Amino acid sequence: VYRAFFTTYLPARTVMAVAALPMDALVQVEALITNGEGTIPNEPQAGDLVKYVNNTHNAPYHALSTQTVAFSHYNNITGQLPIDPATGKMVEGGVAEQAAQCLKNIKAVLTSIDVPFDDIVKVNVFLTDLADVDAVNEVYTRFFPDSGIARAVAYMPARTIVPVAALPMHAKVQI
């Protein structure tokens, strides 16, 4: 069904399990839409909004999603699971090791498109157990802020922590 709607490119996506959805729905889809009103940085708008998609072998890849989709001044990254791209398997260890791998995967995707890690403005963290927040926070502060300039101003992106019933591959965290 997904490919029937996205025939020319695959948008970034995040998959999670929740305890319940409104009106007893079985599936809920969130979409970030652009109608073409916007410009590519430093370029005039010429007709349809250009979308750039990118996948790198330095982060996990899924056949039904693109790692990053850029449009206008925005770039959306698919939710990253704690998968080691070298093995295709989830990293060993607990939630701290999993959170670190998620952030390493995000950094690899950004590096592949020459975007600094500190350009991230919003992060969603999906956790299967809210008791793991402190462990995730400890790892998170090893990654943010990343650059000297960001450290000088104590930059941290906006962040939302979402409790979920389950994640793919029985992961404890997805970022």
What are these regions (language model features)?
Residues 1-104, 108-122, 126-175:
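N-terminal presequence-like segments and the immediate start of the first folded domain
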